[in-house]
A protein has these predicted regions:
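Membrane-interface helix-loop junctions in multi-pass transporters/channels
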Residues: 2-128
Length: 128
């Protein structure tokens, strides 16, 4: 793999093929796990999204607190946890509730994702 492709990942200077592979593989795993969890239909889809996002926020906080190498943060934090959590789904679910004139649900979806996401990231930082 040429250096221009590796540098496009913008991990750290001199990122290796293994780093790029792990990043892409774990990003795919994170997105697949999120998709599977949301399709279990245990709750309304917005509730699943809240759970996945606060879980990911906690793990990102915990990871950052462990102070690993920047490449590890990129691979695990951005690759896996970034694709496990989802901002775009929150926005699409919120837009759908606005379209359906369920404004209270819109506020709840946005509020829970933001407030609980920040709270659980903080808890992860404190426990890490």
């Amino acid at each position: 793999m040429n250096s221009a492709v590796l540098n496009s990942f913008a991990f750290v200077k001199g990122a290796s093929f293994l780093s790029a592979f792990l990043f892409l593989f774990l990003a795919g795993c994170g997105a697949s796990i999120r998709w599977r969890l949301q399709n279990l239909h245990l709750w309304d889809s917005w509730i699943s999204t809240v759970f996945v996002n606060i879980f990911s926020s906690f793990l990102i906080g915990y990871l950052i607190a462990a102070n690993p190498a920047s490449e590890v943060v990129t691979i695990l934090g951005v690759g896996f946890l970034g694709s496990l959590s989802t901002f775009s789904t929150v926005i699409m679910q919120s837009a759908k509730t606005i379209e359906d004139r369920e404004y209270w649900l819109t506020v709840m979806i946005l509020g829970l994702n933001i407030v609980l996401g920040v709270l659980f990231a903080y808890i992860g930082l404190r426990l890490g």
